[in-house]
Amino acid sequence: MHTLDSLDAESLRTDVPEFWPGDTLKVHVRVVEGNRQRIQVFQGAVIRRQGGGVRETFTVRKVSFGVGVERTFPLHSPIVSKIEIVTRGDVRRAKLYYLRQLRGKAAKIKEKRDPISR
């Protein structure tokens, strides 16, 4: 194992849930204002995951007061304190950039239904 690979392995987080584009997440972000620190929740749909290892990022999109807001988070950053999965989305693409042009119900992502075991 190379030196950089071992450094990357030390920096990886183990508490990251498995999520994919189309899923709706609550991302708890650590915000520092002066000498105070608080947690802010950003809830929206994952429109992309990119990269791998320590450098992996994901982008979450939400519509706030009629304006589309996207934030890109480093997956293994200490700024992200917690990631919660709200719903699983059923999409056929890895990058959901087409949601930027859609409005209203057209921008809604179908929810993935788990098969019922009988």
From Swiss-Prot:
Which keywords does this Swiss-Prot/TrEMBL entry list? Ribonucleoprotein, Ribosomal protein
One Pfam match, by short name? Ribosomal_L19
- Is Ribonucleoprotein among this UniProt entry's keywords? yes
The GO terms describing molecular function are:
structural constituent of ribosome
| GO CC terms in record | cytosolic large ribosomal subunit
Q: Name one GO biological process term.
A: translation
Q: Does the keyword Ribonucleoprotein apply?
A: yes
Superkingdom assignment: Bacteria
Q: Which cysteines are joined by disulfide bonds?
A: none
| NCBIfam families hit by this protein | rplS_bact
Instruction: Relate the protein's function as given in its record.
Output: This protein is located at the 30S-50S ribosomal subunit interface and may play a role in the structure and function of the aminoacyl-tRNA binding site.
Q: Which family is it part of?
A: Belongs to the bacterial ribosomal protein bL19 family.
Identification of the protein by name: Large ribosomal subunit protein bL19
